[in-house]
Regions:
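A general structural signal for well-ordered alpha-helical segments in protein cores
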Residues: 18, 38, 54, 76-79
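Active-site neighborhoods of divalent-metal-dependent phosphate/nucleic-acid chemistry enzymes
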Residues: 68-112
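Histidine- and aromatic-rich ligand-binding microenvironments
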Residues: 4, 33-34, 95-96, 117, ...
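Acidic, PIN/NYN-like endoribonuclease modules and their adjacent C-terminal/linker elements
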Residues: 103, 107-132
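A generic structural signal for short hydrophobic patches within well-formed alpha-helices
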Residues: 8-9, 38, 120-121
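Short, well-structured N-terminal submotif of metal-dependent ribonuclease cores
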Residues: 1-33, 46-59
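Short loop->beta-strand "edge-of-pocket" segments that line small-molecule binding or catalytic clefts
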Residues: 30-32, 64-69
């Protein structure tokens, strides 16, 4: 699976979906995250929890054995597609810059996406978990 910022934030903040997301990650042998997503999470966590948050994030990524994937040309093309078709101000999904990294890695790798919220449900990406 590919893991979006929203899922990691939910886990680190112990939100109601945290256990479902943690179990989904643990049960999947493929755990991917775009370097762009990792940067987005780092920016959010640093703003909220300073260096302690960064350490918590890095420890979680290590313990969960999440593989960080470099952003390549194929992902660039898919991210452009994502924004053109589902981007904020263009489509109800309103994907932002960071969302485009997760979308593109999910589509180019053929892996489902783990996310929280309703943005990706309005796209053609496959969800790793359905939260009601």
């Amino acid at each position: 699976m590919v893991i979006d910022t929203s899922a990691i934030i939910a886990i680190l903040n112990l939100e109601p979906e945290a256990t479902v997301f943690t179990n989904a990650i643990a049960s999947d042998s493929v755990r991917l995250m775009s370097m762009g997503t990792a940067l987005e999470i780092s920016i959010i966590i640093k703003a909220r929890k300073e260096e302690a948050g960064i350490r918590e994030l890095e420890f979680f990524l290590y313990k969960a054995a999440i593989n960080l994937v470099n952003f390549d040309e194929n992902q660039l093309k898919m991210a452009r597609y994502a924004f053109e078709h589902y981007g904020k101000g263009r489509h109800p999904a309103s994907l932002n810059f960071g969302d485009c990294f997760a979308y593109s890695l999910s589509k180019t790798s053929g892996q489902p996406l783990l996310f929280k919220g309703n943005d990706f449900t309005q796209t053609d990406v496959t969800a790793a978990v359905t939260i009601s």
